[in-house]
């Protein structure tokens, strides 16, 4: 590939830096530059191109804000109608339906550009009422990160940056970005100890802020959740009465309130969703005929709304007749499927006890460690039904929240689940192995001269902004592949799904955005040479690449792009808007378009959002010592991210009900950021000072102690379920206050697919307020017995607007 005029100065800069750093002609260092010689990344320009990238990214951010304001004013119904429609579908959303007009009133009170001022005027109490506890914990986590970065920004800019500028290893050019990095200090400079000390301080600061955040996480444990056990490993032919009799005989002091077996209802869920859509469409055209006195003809083919003439195969038919026929067919299929489901138990059960202490006692009996000779786990208390129920094979845990359970995924278990998991993740590995990082994608594009016309312009504005924009775009695309692969794994709870997503997306992002580009592995040919060619002199570890003068500028530009372009795109929710547009185009009729509007609201994906934010936070912390100028831009990113998330949580997404473990998982991964900073500093000391230098030994000791502490914490976290103390519970004041109340059994259990209770004879109300949510079977038939249906004052207006 012919080198472009823009890249001609690169070799001379490489020679200059090698001489100044005293690295000589070592192949590792030349590799770092050669790998980027014909690439659009890691370019050496004035101050790393940061001023240019900052100006263009801010301009793009303002443009995205303008576009969002227009879309919100003209097309915001695609989000609002869905939120109003979802409001009355489930008990946990009834706080929305009770004040669904309050959101509109709140915006009207704010005057001009209400969504922008709402970000600053929203109180946590409003967000708690509207979005739930998980949103509060998520925003609290962001606030702790903000305060942490404020402190680190002050220390990095007021202490570390002046120390780096005091060196003269890279000259006195005020436009040189390298002067702000640790590479500007001489190896015999005692001020290098300051960096080591501050890296330890940053570690303790992070631990302190995260500990404070963890203490603030308080969940209102719903008594029904702590009273219910989830049991797997039951024989599929086990009956409800047999399970109840076993607990009555084995644990005479524990009273069973209810036992619910689980069935394979994935297909039933799909059929019921289609039926509700059909019934709504039928009601839409029935009301339209009553209003106009004319019957409506439709073309029931995909994109049929765009057919303006009748040809063979695209004939029009009466809308009421079409949807009546579809509804009758679906009702027949639902009836047949319902009777078939009763013969397909899954070998799982939810068992609810009268008191929490009873469930705790039984859980301790099944899961507590009982070392008896060579047996680590003893048998639970037996009964006359133990052999029939195969009690020794049971796995018993506390049940998750009813809203957290993905009922349709319960049928995927055992070998089938593991084979599906292995297949999905193997395919993911194969795809991502060849597209490991955005840098590799971009360097591969360079091989085909994709970016050659950009270089031919010899315009530093375009040549610096274009790579940064591409880097962010691919950084947003590749995690989406990981995200959707996690959804395909069919986890049984949303909490488990989000928890896996946090770890999976975070680890992948760290490798593709931070570690591999930092080591200079930015093209496929060099990546494979490093991976497989053990005879080449260029295959040793490229730790020198981490500390090249322009390396930090590459990540500063990435953080700037994430702050402005990333936040603007999250506010715009472009993927959701594209999906909405596609579904509206594919809709067959006006009634189908109305259904699309009512099904456009989604729950907030805390797992993916945690992972994305923690990736950028880790990049910031990893370079906070070696490249201190990155920290204030990281603070800007977290501030913008916090404001955008406050808006989206309140105005754009449905509330989610998750377990608190996902928030603790995010805290654990946040603690990895300062540890990576210590690793970076140790590599620098090892390369520049040698292994026997006091600063290197001290950093190495701190790294070892930190790793040891992490291992002990992880092992304790993994094995604490073996301890009976893990199940010790404390009664709340309300529990202690009324003994009589504690003995009142719950009127019903939500751990049951409501579809199975008289679905064939049930007729769903067809108003927009009766729209189902996502996955929980009880949602399909509306509210539970004994629960009032909250009336939505804005429902009529929304319905009228949809029909217009």
UniProtKB/Swiss-Prot annotation:
Subunit composition and interactions: Monomer.
Protein name as annotated: Mechanosensitive cation channel TMEM63A
Domain of life of the organism encoding this protein: Eukaryota
Region of interest: Intracellular linker IL2: 218-413
Glycosylation site residues: 38, 449
GO molecular function: calcium-activated cation channel activity; mechanosensitive monoatomic ion channel activity; nucleic acid binding; osmolarity-sensing monoatomic cation channel activity
Species whose genome carries this gene: Mus musculus (Mouse)
Primary location: membrane
């Amino acid at each position: 590939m012919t080198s472009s005029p823009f890249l001609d100065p690169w070799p001379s800069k490489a020679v200059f830096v090698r001489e100044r750093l005293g690295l000589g002609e070592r192949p590792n260092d030349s590799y770092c530059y050669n790998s980027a010689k014909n690439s659009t990344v890691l370019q050496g320009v004035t101050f790393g191109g940061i001023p240019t990238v900052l100006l263009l990214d801010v301009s793009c951010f303002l443009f995205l804000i303008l576009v969002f304001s227009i879309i919100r004013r003209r097309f915001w119904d695609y989000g609002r109608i869905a939120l109003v429609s979802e409001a009355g579908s489930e008990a946990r959303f009834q706080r929305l339906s009770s004040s669904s007009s309050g959101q509109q009133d709140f915006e009207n009170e704010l005057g001009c550009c209400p969504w922008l001022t709402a970000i600053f005027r929203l109180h946590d109490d409003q967000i708690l009422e509207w979005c739930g506890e998980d949103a509060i914990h998520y925003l609290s986590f962001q606030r702790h990160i903000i305060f942490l970065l404020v402190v680190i920004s002050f220390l990095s800019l007021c202490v570390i940056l002046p120390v780096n500028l005091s060196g003269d290893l890279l000259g006195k050019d005020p436009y040189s970005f390298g002067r702000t990095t640790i590479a500007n200090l001489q190896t015999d400079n005692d001020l290098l100890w300051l960096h080591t000390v501050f890296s330890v301080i940053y570690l303790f600061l992070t631990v302190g802020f995260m500990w404070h955040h963890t203490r603030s996480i308080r969940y209102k444990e719903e008594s029904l959740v702590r009273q219910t056990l989830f049991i797997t490993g039951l024989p599929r032919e086990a009956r409800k009465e047999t399970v109840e009799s076993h607990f009555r005989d084995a644990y005479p002091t524990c009273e069973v309130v209810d036992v619910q077996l689980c069935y394979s209802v994935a297909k039933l869920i799909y059929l019921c969703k289609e039926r509700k859509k059909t019934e709504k469409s039928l009601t839409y055209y029935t009301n339209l005929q009553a209003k106009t006195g004319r019957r409506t003809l439709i073309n029931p083919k995909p994109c049929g709304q765009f057919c303006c003439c009748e040809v063979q195969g695209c004939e029009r038919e009466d809308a009421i007749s079409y949807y009546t026929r579809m509804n009758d067919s679906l009702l027949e299929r639902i009836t047949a499927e319902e009777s078939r489901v009763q013969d397909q138990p899954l070998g799982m059960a939810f068992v609810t006890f009268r008191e929490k202490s009873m469930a705790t006692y039984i859980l301790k009996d099944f899961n507590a460690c009982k070392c008896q000779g060579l047996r680590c786990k003893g048998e639970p208390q037996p009964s006359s039904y133990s052999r029939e129920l195969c009690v020794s094979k049971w796995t018993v845990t506390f049940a998750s929240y009813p809203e957290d359970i993905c009922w349709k995924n319960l049928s995927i278990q055992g070998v089938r689940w593991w084979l599906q998991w292995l297949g999905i993740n193997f395919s993911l590995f194969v795809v991502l192995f060849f597209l490991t990082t955005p840098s590799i994608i971009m360097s591969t594009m360079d091989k085909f001269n994709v970016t050659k016309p950009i270089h031919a312009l010899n315009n530093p504005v375009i040549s610096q902004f274009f790579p940064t924009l591409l880097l962010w775009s691919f950084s947003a695309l590749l995690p989406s592949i990981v995200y959707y692969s996690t959804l395909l794994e069919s986890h049984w709870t949303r909490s488990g799904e989000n928890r896996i997503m946090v770890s999976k997306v975070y680890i992948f992002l760290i490798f593709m955005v931070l570690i591999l580009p930092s080591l200079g592995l930015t093209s496929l040919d060099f990546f494979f040479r490093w991976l497989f060619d053990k005879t080449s002199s260029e295959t040793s570890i490229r730790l020198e690449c981490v500390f090249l003068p322009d390396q930090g500028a590459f990540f500063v530009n990435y953080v700037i792009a994430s702050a402005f372009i990333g936040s603007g795109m999250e506010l715009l929710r472009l993927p959701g808007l594209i999906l909405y547009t596609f579904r509206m185009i594919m809709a067959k009729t006006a009634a189908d378009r109305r259904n699309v509007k009512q099904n456009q609201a989604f729950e907030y994906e805390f797992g993916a959002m945690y992972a994305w934010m923690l990736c950028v936070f880790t990049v910031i912390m990893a370079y906070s010592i070696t490249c201190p100028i990155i920290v204030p831009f990281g603070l800007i990113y977290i501030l913008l991210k916090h404001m955008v998330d406050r808006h989206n949580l309140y105005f754009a997404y449905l509330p989610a009900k998750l377990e608190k473990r996902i928030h603790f998982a995010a805290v654990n991964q946040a603690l990895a950021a300062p540890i990576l900073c210590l690793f970076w500093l140790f590599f620098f000391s090892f390369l520049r000072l040698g292994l026997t230098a006091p600063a290197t030994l001290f950093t190495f000791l701190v790294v070892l102690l930190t790793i040891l502490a992490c291992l002990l914490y992880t092992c304790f976290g993994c094995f604490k379920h073996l301890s009976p103390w893990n199940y010790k519970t404390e009664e709340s004041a309300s529990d202690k206050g009324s003994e009589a109340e504690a003995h009142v059994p719950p009127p019903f259990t939500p751990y049951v697919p409501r579809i199975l209770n008289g679905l064939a004879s049930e007729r769903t109300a067809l108003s927009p307020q009766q729209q189902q949510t996502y996955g929980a079977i009880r949602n399909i038939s509306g509210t539970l017995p004994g629960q009032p249906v909250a009336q939505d004052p804005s429902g009529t207006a929304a319905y009228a607007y949809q029909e217009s």
